[in-house]
C-alpha cells in the first residue's frame, strides 16, 4: 500500500468517519457522501499531512478514492523529483 493511499484512508476513516468497508475501489465520492465542502476539507487535511498542494482543477478530475490517491501520488513524485529534495 502506498503512503498516499494509507494517509488518505486514515484521514477518511479518522476525520470523516468513512467506514473502511465502504471505500471500495469503484465507490464514487458521492457514494461515500463526500460533497464539495468535504472535498475542500479533505484537500486541506491531505496537504497538511503530506505537504502537497492540490489545485481546484485537479479536484474536479476526482470521481473515486483511487482518483484522489493517484493525484496525491503524482504530487509526491513531482515533489521528490525537484532539485534539492
Please provide the spans of the model-predicted regions:
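Phosphopantetheine-dependent thiolation modules in NRPS/PKS and related acyl-activating systems
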Residues: 1-32, 38-43, 48-85
